Amino acid sequence: MNLRDKFENGSILSEDYVLPTIIRLGIIRQIPIFLYINMSSVQFLNKLIPIYSQIDKDKLKENRLSPEEWNLLDQKMSELYNAPLWLNDIEVNSVDDYKSAEEVIAKEKIKYVFIDSLPEAIDKSEIIEWSEEVGFNVYFTNFTLK
């Protein structure tokens, strides 16, 4: 069962589901994913890396890794670096701002777009309609900084 079978286009997904999904689809299965995030890409990666590497985030922050963990981190960072993930951490205020990435989405054959915290002024149905025109599924989430 894939994401499209589980959730209809335009579904709202929790962060607890989205981050492992990004890992499974984008990194492991190499399916292109585009993410609009409302935090810096560094903050987002600081959330994703501990989950993907399965290394305690406090150990990463404090730089207290064993040699084996350093090797694992190096391997996982290489996989993450080579994954077909596109991050947009630029503030988005209109549907046209989202559409500005359409060329990349089409060229890279991106199948899944995740949008973090859709601004209230933007009509979700317009984004869903655009996704159907271009040929990708869009999912909405809210990444909180824990």
Predicted regions and their residues:
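Structured core elements
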Residues: 11, 33-36, 86, 114, ...
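Residue-level marker for well-ordered alpha-helical positions
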Residues: 19-20, 99, 125
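Cytosolic-facing regulatory segments adjacent to core modules
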Residues: 3-4, 28-109, 122
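Substrate-engagement module of ASCE P-loop NTPases
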Residues: 23, 27, 120-146
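Active-site-proximal structural scaffolding
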Residues: 15-18, 37, 41, 123, ...
